[in-house]
Swiss-Prot record:
HAMAP family: NDP_kinase (MF_00451). Belongs to the NDK family. PROSITE patterns: NDPK_LIKE. The lineage of its organism: Eukaryota, Metazoa, Chordata, Craniata, Vertebrata. It comes from Xenopus laevis. This is Nucleoside diphosphate kinase 3-B. Its EC number is 2.7.4.6.
Length: 169
């Protein structure tokens, strides 16, 4: 219900999450956590110039995961996906920057690692589609919904990046 209200609110009032304030949700999945890829993944987004505004390590509940993946509930792999995502720690993150949703998806690579180019996270670290290390929002709308699911507003840190003038014109 909360997600529905937030979605309606987001459509009525234009988001402040545009331009260099655009935000996306990323989650390092249990396989990425167990394989100790956190530092490498975070490093890539920091080096790109994006700003980390929230991060936490959680053992996601089945309820949260079912809400998160609700659009996939009719897919044959849905139950396996929810079980897998609940099998270990997940690192939930919010990143901010210009075109961060689109750029993060490019940096992550295709859902199926076999179709991901070298240099992408999945191209470099994944083999199997069922263990593809990281989730990234696929649109601004998804990002807003997913951020609201995983984080309370007071968990997002607003800070001035001293390098911003060296990243953006």
């Amino acid at each position: 219900m909360i997600c529905l209200v937030l979605t309606i609110f987001a459509h009525i009032f234009p988001s402040a999450w545009t331009g260099i304030n655009e935000r996306t949700f990323l989650a390092i999945k249990p396989d990425g956590y167990q394989r100790r890829l956190l530092g490498e993944i975070i490093r890539r987004f920091e080096k790109k110039g994006f700003r980390l505004v929230a991060m936490k390590i959680v053992q996601a509940s089945e309820k949260l995961l079912k809400q998160h993946y609700i659009a996939l509930q009719d897919k044959p792999f849905y139950d396996r996906l929810v079980k897998y995502m609940g099998s270990g720690p997940v690192v939930a993150m919010v990143w901010q920057g210009l075109d961060v949703v689109k750029t993060a998806r490019l940096m992550i690579g295709e859902t199926n690692p076999a179709h991901s180019l070298p240099g992408t996270i999945r191209g470099d670290f994944c083999i199997d589609v069922g263990r593809n290390v990281i989730h990234g929002s696929d649109s601004r709308e998804s990002a807003e919904r997913e951020i609201a699911l995983w984080f309370q507003p007071d968990e997002l840190v607003y800070w001035q990046d001293s390098a911003e003038s060296w990243i953006y014109e």
